[in-house]
């Protein structure tokens, strides 16, 4: 998690290559620094490096509902909620510059936002954020659901990606049963089935 590259488009091969080169160079530099500045680390070697860099953010769909950071902060309740998750933000660089104060405030996001789970606050994810506006028989799960740039840093957690994935899978099965499009799925029935799978959804 040490090396980071900013301002790259993960859908462009040129940017992927640039990011790979930058991050691998950073790894070499930090290892060299540790070896030369810490006696106890003078003999360390690189055992392995991830086969490719991972992106925290990329394209997101335009869904029937776009989640916003304001909704998450307000703990907005939706009639079509399919997941509830602890309030958590982890964004390395909203503006591609590492100069933030680690807090979420206003719309002038800068640098580094990191707010771990500190209390009982949660946010909900509506089913509509999984449903694209223009494609009838498609559901999207994970970090690419419909959300704004900063809200994405709260929804990209792996466990929440799993929850949206489970909801999408159950909804797809329900759509087949009901012979309906994804937007027409009976959300109350979807929520009922998710609760049977021990998913904690408000009544």
What is each model feature region?
Residues 1-203:
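Flavin (FAD/FMN)-binding glycine-rich loop and adjacent Rossmann-like elements that form
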